[in-house]
Amino acid sequence: MYKRQQLSSEFDDYDRGNDSRRIEASARGTYQGPRHQLSFVFHHLRYVNSHYKRKSDGESERVYESFDRFSLVVDFPWVRGVMVRSDLPNTKSKKRKVFETTSDDFNRSFNFTGDSELACAKFATPTTLAFLLELRRRLKKVNLEFSSEGHLCLSFDDAEVMAYKDPGTFDDLPSFYANIEQGLPLPNLFPVLALVHELAELHDNNFDLPLKVTDEMEQ
């Protein structure tokens, strides 16, 4: 299972929080789509921002705000070195050139960067841009980071993605994630994974064989 330091070295989204940040829990699984079997790990990140606020007596006090962020890290070899973000994690993120596409709606909705102009141009097909605009309507503050290692980090603010039919909340995290590992039905998660599979189908034209999860990929 990934550690936060490992995640933050590969993806900017795990660098949130100017005070503290930690992975509350993770859960591993696979999704079998019509063409590809996708290995994924779900992560629940909790991070804290702090700032100083001046009180009525002129003194300053430090105020802490806690936030939750959710993500799926998926084996995704078809796209590398591209970042599409509707919500930038922090001002400390590496400065990268922003690429403009032919879609004004997309340019207004996303910060689109990459390792090279060629990688961005190959990724930004009209069909993909339309798909991402629809994804933004489905998930709050959605970000997609395609690493050079062949992984996709799909991150968002929607806690409901991991909601399940039985009563329960994040109040008892160990039990919650233990149930997930045991195969608890997650009706809101698999539609999101189906969207990831749809994106894979848009970009797997250079691959002759469907992707299957191997022991090496699971490590």
Where are these regions (language model features)?
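Charged, low-complexity intrinsically disordered regions
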Residues: 4-219
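Active-site loops and adjacent core secondary-structure elements that bind or stabilize anionic groups
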Residues: 1
